[in-house]
């Protein structure tokens, strides 16, 4: 047998941990008890219930009462009286800007609502750390959403029934066709629903007996399932941190 070496074995260099992908799902005006995992006996939300069961479920929150302040707080980690809510200045640093500095590619799909609902270029998503943006800069109070792709106005839609699916399709398209597979990603998907004026597809209205709010909640759950299935199909599920929350509860 060979003699044991008098020298200690070389220390293996530790591999750098793989950076996780990050998916943030953010709904609008959704109530605490709207999901099965938070007590709803009426709304069927199997996808989000499974997410809660497999992950960490938080049950006590402090939230802002309205959209803009909640969103600026989420984006910056700062109290709304500092980050200014709907009037969030270009000088605020978002989590997207921080993540870009450490190699992330960044995308925002859906409702922005921190640029006073106006196309102010230096306060829109592309200027606040997001490489890609598709969505509405404000709310759908009038039953319409004005849509931008990056900084470009692409049109106005009054199809509130199709908005959740549209945003999900854009998020899926980003994952499948646009992201760089060699980099970790941040995808911030901020749905307009369940903010009034609400609507859902004919399929979910029929499924819920024309209970419109239930239809909106259940369609969101279904569309979330499509998105999570896409992560799994692409082999990304095990290395993606999924965070789901709502902005402020029912309005």
Language-model segments: which ranges?
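Formylglycine-dependent sulfatase
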Residues: 1-251
């Amino acid at each position: 047998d060979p003699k044991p070496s008098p020298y200690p074995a070389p220390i293996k260099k530790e591999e750098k941990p793989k950076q996780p992908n990050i998916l943030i799902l953010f709904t609008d005006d959704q109530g605490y008890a709207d999901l099965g995992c938070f007590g709803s006996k009426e709304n069927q939300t199997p996808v989000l219930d499974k997410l809660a069961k497999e992950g960490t479920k938080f049950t006590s929150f402090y939230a802002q009462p309205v959209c803009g302040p909640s969103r600026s707080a989420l984006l910056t980690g700062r109290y709304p009286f500092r980050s200014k809510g709907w009037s969030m200045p270009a000088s605020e640093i978002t989590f997207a800007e921080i993540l870009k500095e450490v190699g992330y590619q960044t995308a925002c799909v859906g409702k922005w609502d921190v640029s006073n609902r106006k196309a102010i270029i230096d306060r829109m998503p592309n200027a606040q750390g997001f490489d890609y943006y598709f969505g509405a800069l404000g709310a759908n109070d009038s039953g319409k959403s004005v849509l931008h792709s990056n900084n470009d106005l692409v049109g106005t839609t009054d199809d509130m029934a199709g908005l959740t699916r549209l945003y999900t399709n854009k998020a899926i398209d980003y994952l499948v066709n646009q992201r760089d597979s060699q980099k970790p990603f941040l995808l911030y998907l901020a749905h307009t629903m369940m903010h009034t004026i609400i609507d859902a597809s004919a399929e979910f209205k029929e499924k819920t007996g024309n209970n419109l709010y239930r239809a909106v909640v259940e369609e969101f759950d279904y569309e979330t399932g499509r998105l999570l299935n896409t992560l799994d199909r692409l082999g990304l599920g095990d290395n993606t941190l999924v965070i789901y929350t709502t902005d402020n509860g029912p309005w």
